[in-house]
C-alpha cells in the first residue's frame, strides 16, 4: 500500500476509534517515537495501522460486493436457470429447443392457445411469467431433492424455512458441494 494511502487509512482509523488530537499523538509517540504521520516511514505507518486494528479498527470496503458484474436481462436469467436445472439433473434436456418448447407451452395457456414459439420473441409480462414460473419449478425440484435425500429443508438463522429463490438455490448448491446430496 502506498504511503499516502496508509496515512489516509490511519486518519480514518483515528476517527473511527474516536481519538482526540492529544491521545492520537501520544499513541504515535508510544508506537514510533514520533508525533506525526508525516515523519514516519512506510514500515512505521504499517505498524501504526496494525496497532489501530488491534485496538478495534476494521477497514471496510468502500463499495460492497455486487451480485452481478453487469446487468443480466430476464431472458438471460431464464436461460441460466434452465441450464442450472439441467446441470442439477432436474430436466433431461438443457438445450435451446427444449427451452423454446417449454416457453411455447407456458405462453400458450396465457394467450388462448397460441404460444410464443421461442424465448427470443418473449417480451414484457410474458417473459416475466416465464421467469417466475421457472423459478418456482426449480424451487419445487430442490425441495423434492432435499426430501428424497432425507435432508431437512434449509432454514434461516432465525429458524424460519427458506423460501426465496436465491436462498434455496444457494442451500442446494451448498448441500451438493458438501456431498450431502449425490450428484
Curated annotation (Swiss-Prot):
- One of the GO biological process terms: symbiont-mediated perturbation of host cell cycle progression
Q: Which Pfam families does this entry report, sorted A to Z?
A: GemA
Q: Where in the cell is it found?
A: Host cytoplasm
Does this entry carry the keyword Cytoplasm? Answer: no
What GO cellular-component annotations does this UniProt entry give? Answer: host cell cytoplasm
What induces or represses expression of this protein, per its UniProt record? This protein is constitively expressed from the Pgem promoter unlike most other early proteins which are expressed under the control of the Pe promoter. Its expression seems to escape repression by repressor protein c and thus occurs throughout latency.
Q: Would I find Magnesium among this entry's keywords? A: no
Assigned keywords, A-Z: Early protein, Host cytoplasm, Host-virus interaction, Modulation of host cell cycle by virus
> Which InterPro entries has this protein been placed in?
Phage_Mu_Gp16
Q: Which domain of life is it from?
A: Viruses
Q: Kindly report the protein's main subcellular placement as a broad class.
A: host cell
Role according to the record: Early protein responsible for decreasing host DNA gyrase activity. Promotes DNA relaxation of bacterial host genome. Modulates the expression of various host genes probably controlled by supercoiling of their promoters. Host genes affected include DNA replication and cell division determinants.
Which protein family is it in? Belongs to the mulikevirus gemA protein family.
Task: Spell out the subunit comment.
Answer: Homodimer.
Q: What is this protein called in UniProt?
A: GemA protein
Q: Organism, per UniProt?
A: Escherichia phage D108 (Bacteriophage D108)
Gene expressing this chain: gemA
Amino acid at each position: 500500500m502506498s504511503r499516502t494511502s496508509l496515512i489516509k487509512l490511519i486518519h480514518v482509523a483515528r476517527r473511527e476509534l474516536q481519538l482526540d488530537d492529544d491521545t492520537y499523538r501520544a499513541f504515535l509517540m508510544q508506537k514510533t517515537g514520533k508525533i506525526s504521520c508525516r515523519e514516519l516511514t512506510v514500515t512505521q505507518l504499517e505498524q501504526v495501522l496494525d496497532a489501530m486494528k488491534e485496538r478495534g479498527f476494521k477497514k471496510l470496503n468502500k463499495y460492497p460486493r455486487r451480485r452481478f458484474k453487469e446487468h443480466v436481462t430476464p431472458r438471460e436469467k431464464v436461460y441460466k436457470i434452465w441450464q442450472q436445472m439441467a446441470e442439477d439433473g432436474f430436466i433431461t434436456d438443457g438445450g435451446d429447443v427444449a427451452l423454446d418448447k417449454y416457453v411455447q407451452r407456458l405462453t400458450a395457456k396465457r394467450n388462448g392457445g397460441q404460444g410464443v414459439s421461442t424465448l427470443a420473441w418473449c417480451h414484457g409480462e410474458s417473459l416475466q411469467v416465464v421467469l417466475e414460473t421457472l423459478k418456482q419449478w426449480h424451487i419445487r425440484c430442490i425441495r423434492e431433492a432435499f426430501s428424497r435425500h432425507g435432508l431437512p429443508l434449509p432454514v434461516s438463522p432465525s429458524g424460519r424455512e427458506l423460501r426465496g429463490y436465491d436462498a434455496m438455490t444457494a442451500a442446494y448448491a451448498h448441500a451438493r458441494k458438501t456431498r450431502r446430496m449425490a450428484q
